[in-house]
Curated annotation (Swiss-Prot):
This is 5'-nucleotidase SurE 2. The keyword Nucleotide-binding applies. Keywords: Cytoplasm, Hydrolase, Metal-binding, Nucleotide-binding, Plasmid. Coiled coil: none annotated. Its EC number is 3.1.3.5. It comes from Thermus thermophilus (strain ATCC BAA-163 / DSM 7039 / HB27).
Amino acid sequence: MRILVTNDDGIYSPGLWALAEAASQFGEVFVAAPDTEQSATGHAITIAHPVRAYPHPAPLHGPHFPAYQVRGTPADCVALGLHLFGPVDLVLSGVNLGSNLGHEIWHSGTVAAAKQGYLFGLSAAAFSVPLNGEVPDFAGLRPWLLRTLETLLRLERPFLVNVNLPLRPKGFLWTRQSVRAYEGVVIPGEDPMGRPFYWFASRPLKEAEEGTDRWAVAQGFVSATPLRLDLTDETRLQPALAQE
C-alpha cells in the first residue's frame, strides 16, 4: 500500500511525523506538507501563482520518508504530492495540533487535505488531537493511531473519515458530526504604533449531544466520523421539487 501523509500545521510539526511513522506500519509512506503553518485555510487551492516544492532533508534521528515541503495549502500538498510521488492508495492528514470537531471541519485545512484526496477517488482520513494546555504525547498516542488505522482499513473503499483523539484515550467510538453553535467574539487591540488590530475568537453555546464527535472526545474516546461531500439537503429538496 502506498500512503501520502500531509497536514496543515506544516512540515516541522511533530504530529505529521507521528502519523507518518504509524502509517509506515501499513505501507510505503510519502510526505508532502506545507512549508509554513496553514491552519484554518480550509479547502483553498493556489491559482494566482505557481506552487513550489523542495525536497525535505532527512532528520538526524528517527525514520525518514521521501518528503517535500510545499509552498502552498494543504489541498495543494495533496494534489502536488500525487504528481511528485505517483499514485497512492490512501491519503492521511494530521495529526493536527488542535481538535477538528463539529463545524470546525468547515475551515479545517487538515480535513480539507483529506477531502482533496477523496475528491481524487482515494480513501482518506484526517487526524486531530486537542490542545488543552499540554503537549500531546505522540508516543503514548501511537497505539491508538495504529488501532484506528487498522479499523479504517477494514472499511469499504473509498472512505472519508474525520478522526479526533483525546490526549489520553480510553476507547474508540464511531460518531456523528456535532452541530456546534458558536458565539462569535472580536477582541480588539492596539500595536505599539497605535494601529488597531483584532483577534477573532468564539465560545460554544451548546453542550455536545451524546454520540457526537465532541461528546466522544470529552468522554475520553477516539472519535471517528464518516463524512460525505454531497451537501444536498434532501429534506428541503423534495418539498421544493413538489412545488414545481
